[in-house]
Amino acid sequence: YAGAMGYGQFIPTSYQAYAVDFDNDGVTDLVNNPVDAIGSVANYFSEHNWKPGLPVAARAHLDGAGYVPLAKKGYKPSFTLAQANNAGVSALSCNDDRLVSEYCFDLPASTRVALLDLTGTDGAEFWLATDNFYVITRYNHSRLYGLAVLQLTRPLAAALEDNQ
């Protein structure tokens, strides 16, 4: 037990810095009020430079072994997509009919990314992660947590879209 509280499991210092009264009822309540809790997580992301519209991550395709040094750089974006491409690493394109993946992006070559080397059910998985992935990992420092958040948002977004 680390003293985390409420829906978002904020630690006390995060509560002091980022909790907000999102529904404007005069009380900031992350324990009993999901509106304040969600608003506070959004505030945390905003304060950590979340970039609206920027995808979080895409599956990566590797060509050769040039990816190895990139995979050792951690998950803070530290190189561009152009540099990744030069090392034989590319994001799955959303416009490529040959590859079907809901985890794709088509971003400018200047976009800063990180290469994640993970183990999935079928073996090694590689992902190119953007600054928004890094923001998620400021909330919880596990790259597996960051990827789980990404993967859980897909069915939630689909359900929300179906209900509109």
What are these regions (language model features)?
Residues 10, 36, 40, 128, ...:
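Generic recognition of stable, solvent-exposed alpha-helical segments in well-folded globular domains
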Residues 5-20, 41:
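Substrate-binding/active-site groove segments that recognize
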Residues 21-30:
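Acidic, glycine-anchored loop motifs typical of Ca2+
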Residues 50-58:
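Acidic/polar loop patches that form or flank catalytic/metal-binding clefts of enzymes
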